[in-house]
Regions:
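Short, hydrophobic/aromatic-enriched beta-strand segments in well-ordered soluble domains
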Residues: 82-84, 88, 101-103, 185-199, ...
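Ligand-binding face of N-terminal immunoglobulin V-set domains in extracellular IgSF glycoproteins
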Residues: 76-105, 109-112
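Hydrophobic helix-coil surface modules that form long, contiguous segments used
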Residues: 220-234, 240-425, 454
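Glycine/proline-rich low-complexity spacer/linker segments in large multi-domain proteins
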Residues: 109-127, 194-252, 273
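Hydrophobic alpha-helical and helix-loop surface patches within well-folded domains
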Residues: 21, 30-43, 48, 320, ...
Length: 556
């Protein structure tokens, strides 16, 4: 989520620190509260070991998606059909399935709209009057019961049904006439859907008007499986705007049909470049794949040129695939400048850093450096923690402050210099938390925002010889504020935090704690070994806070 939120709350934080630092309060330190034997509320289990590793019987369900979608750039309407292949690897038969319908946040009668304060919020649609939310059409199921896993699967029988379902706010419950088998039961869920995009979609998606056309940044745009796990069973907390996401991993095949004058970028790799790019653009992309410097794929002077788009059809379908992902987002516009460079990964593999942005953002102190920032960020985290897994890392200018998705991020078209570096680096840091290490953001915001803010501090120190290196802070001055008992605990779910406190409690305070642990308690070597082991253990899995704490204690 946006680093702008962190910066704004940090400014308030400094003001508060100035006030509280004038007096020295008596320490409230209590050894028994901090280190008592009751810290861990349960012992290790078959699915999660006491040492912080996934247990010998750890299981996780999966969800693959095939989605065909079209964009009407005049009405801002998205129309699609999807097939979700859901595999139940749990030891439980499932009598029903839960689906997330995040666009329903923008219905007039949604729970999220009901709790937006009268003085405004970054959540919701900022008062836009429109017909928001999903329209759900046909829903059907095809499922195959495989039963318990064996070395050789027996022949399975497929059954097609039209299920009963009910929609409550941002959730959809599909009732199964026949339970989905445990330990490998598979079902295909087919859903037709459409929605009208908000202009401002809770600072996570939306539509930006530019002089050369609209930029459509599409996220939370398709019905998505809820997670069924060994902690809570079905995770069905509603989407209210502040709490982010918890999703299953899988493979996504996405076909996006748009007007031919649009360029499209999406999570993953493009499968049909010859059908959607000109010969010149294909050649420029080949050059970029070999270049450590930014190469222009489509320049500012080509944005309105018919020669910069294929001429054969009125509409084009762009086909993308991403594997080992928990989500997918995309962007489409006729207004894009497009540039790229290669990313060098520790294994010797290559990926592509790409940026798309309007002419309004095209200057050397702004988005002309976006690909440079993207490349540096991905290369740093890949070298320091674990290798970037996707074929491209794409930065898109939009009307979002900053928002992250697998392989693609949306950042403010107004950002420049240090601000653009900061938001770009922050959003791409989220590839590691929570895109690779898939924690439950809706419950534990600090496990992605706090961890990410921490690794951002190291990448910023390293970038370009310290070009934007932050000054060292006096933690003694901050201590009174960090233990302010008028603020909620860090572990409070984000939907239950005061909005003004989210930046401190989810971002800064956990980051400060990790920095102190690394710099002053464990030391860099011991901390880095344990933190890297946590990433390796829980890549593409669903860790809880206890899994993190146990790993850090056992490894360090």
């Amino acid at each position: 989520m946006t680093k702008l939120l962190y910066r704004l709350t940090y400014a308030l934080f400094l003001a508060s620190v100035y006030c509280v630092a004038q007096t020295t309060e008596k320490s409230v330190y209590d050894y028994n509260a901090a280190f008592g034997h009751g810290f861990y509320t349960n012992n290790g289990t078959e699915t999660r070991s006491a040492s912080g590793k996934p247990g010998h019987a750890y299981w996780q369900n999966s969800a693959d998606y095939f989605i065909q979608v079209s964009l009407d750039d005049q009405s801002k309407k998205i129309t699609g059909t999807e097939t979700i292949t859901y595999v139940n690897n749990s030891p439980d038969e499932l009598d029903f399935l839960w689906i997330q319908l995040d666009q329903n946040l923008f219905k007039k009668d949604s729970r999220g709209n009901a709790i937006i304060p009268l003085n405004g919020s970054r959540n919701g649609a900022k008062g836009q009057e429109f017909d928001g939310g999903f329209n759900i059409g046909n829903v059907s199921l095809n499922y195959t019961t495989l039963g318990k896993k064996t070395k050789k699967k027996s022949k399975s029988k497929s059954l097609s049904v039209s299920p009963n379902y009910e929609i409550t706010d941002t959730r959809m419950k599909i009732k199964l006439s026949k339970p989905l088998a445990s330990n490998g039961g598979e079902i295909k869920i087919n859903i037709d859907f459409s929605f009208t995009s908000p202009d401002y979609g809770s600072d996570r998606m939306g539509v930006l008007e530019t002089k050369n056309g609209r930029i459509f940044n599409m996220a939370q745009w398709y019905p998505r499986m809820c997670v069924y796990d060994d902690i809570l069973g079905w995770n069905t907390l509603p989407y209210l705007g502040a709490g982010e996401f918890y999703l299953e991993y899988g493979t996504f095949d996405i076909h996006i049909n748009v007007p031919k004058d649009h360029l499209v970028v999406c999570s993953g790799g493009l499968l049909n470049p010859e059908e959607v790019y000109t010969a010149k653009q294909l050649n420029n992309l080949k050059q970029a794949a070999k270049s450590d410097e930014t190469v222009i794929i489509r320049g500012a002077n080509e944005v309105n040129s018919q020669d910069s788009r294929p001429q054969a059809k009125e509409r084009l379908t762009w086909k993308f695939r991403i594997e080992n992902a928990r989500d997918v987002a995309w962007s489409s516009s006729s207004a894009f400048i497009f540039d790229a460079a290669r990313i060098n990964l520790p294994s010797g593999k290559k990926a592509m850093a790409m940026s798309v942005y309007p002419v309004e953002s095209n200057s050397r102190d702004a988005w002309a450096r976006s690909t440079e920032y993207t490349k540096a960020s991905i290369e740093h985290y890949s070298e320091k923690w674990s290798e970037y897994p996707y074929p491209a890392a794409i930065n898109v200018a939009g009307n979002q402050g900053g928002m992250e998705y697998p392989g693609i991020v949306f950042c403010s078209w107004k950002s420049k210099n240090e601000s653009l570096w900061g938001v770009t680096d922050h959003e791409f840091g989220h590839i590691w938390f929570p895109m690779i290490v898939g924690s439950n953001e809706r419950l534990h915001a600090w496990m992605d925002e706090g961890f990410n803010t921490f690794i951002n501090s190291l990448s910023t120190d390293a970038f370009n010889g310290g070009e934007y290196k932050e000054r060292q802070r006096n933690m003694h001055r901050f201590s009174s504020f960090l233990v302010n008992d008028k603020m909620e605990p860090v572990a409070t779910p984000p939907d239950n935090l005061k909005e003004r406190n989210l930046g401190i409690l989810a971002y800064y305070k956990p980051s400060a704690g990790l920095t102190m642990l690394r710099e002053h308690i464990l030391g860099k070597e011991r901390f880095d070994e344990a933190f890297t082991e946590y990433i390796n253990r829980w890549s593409y899995k669903h860790p809880t806070p206890n899994d993190f704490f146990r790993t850090m204690e056992n490894v360090s």
